[in-house]
């Protein structure tokens, strides 16, 4: 009898440990603490993209957008910058990371909402061009966006203090110089 309980307890412990160790979000989801998008943990992506701008999580755009963005013609005018990689292998590794973690390949809630807002062939090059993100920011007065602490909606971390951790939750929004909160 003791052996049976020991076996069941061991299997239960192994099951929960495997949930915890296999993916950051599975264990958290079990307890209702789901992240919005997968945080960026890829050192190459952080170095190559994060050196110039906030390293936007791949889960904020579909794979087709990342593929379009990484084409040579798009890289020649990447939001006003000419992007050149020292090696083609770097470009391939970055694209692979982006596609693997893109919104259409992600189980995270914000990624799913972004995908639901897009039509089948939409491939926006900017996160701000996705209908979901546009809707979420539509009620924010321009004067709050234009203030020096924010400057532009592409400055996610100005208001989303935990953006780098993949948390864009409404409860974590702090618009500089206000006590305002914007919710769904």
Where are these regions (language model features)?
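Bacterial N-terminal signal peptides that target proteins for export
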Residues: 1-9
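N-terminal signal peptide c-region/cleavage motif recognized by signal peptidases
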Residues: 16-18
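Sequence context surrounding c-type heme c attachment/ligation sites in exported
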Residues: 24-50, 55-92, 96, 102-184
